[in-house]
Amino acid sequence: LLCLQKYSPGRETSQTCLAGENICFKKWKKGEKTSRXGCAVTCPKXK
């Protein structure tokens, strides 16, 4: 099953990941054009 998680580090970003896997999202700094990548907690199983 796939789970959808929304992250809003200034912008609403949604990424899909397999249950039990780690998903990565990009963090945008204000005034900077660089993006930092981070790993979120594993996707919740079920549902």
From Swiss-Prot:
**SUPFAM superfamilies hit by this protein:** Snake toxin-like
Q: Does the keyword Secreted apply?
A: yes
> Where is it located?
Secreted
Please state the protein's primary subcellular location.
secreted
Recite the UniProt keywords alphabetically: Disulfide bond, Secreted, Toxin
Disulfide partners? C3-C24, C17-C39
- Can you provide one Gene Ontology molecular function annotated for this UniProt record? toxin activity
Protein family per UniProt: Belongs to the three-finger toxin family. Short-chain subfamily. Orphan group III sub-subfamily.
- Which tissues is this chain's protein expressed in? Expressed by the venom gland.
Top-level taxon of the source organism: Eukaryota
The Gene Ontology CC terms held by the record are:
extracellular region
Q: Which organism is it from?
A: Micrurus pyrrhocryptus
Record protein name field: Short neurotoxin D2A
Show the InterPro entries listed in the entry. Answer: Snake_3FTx, Snake_toxin-like_sf, Toxin_cobra-type
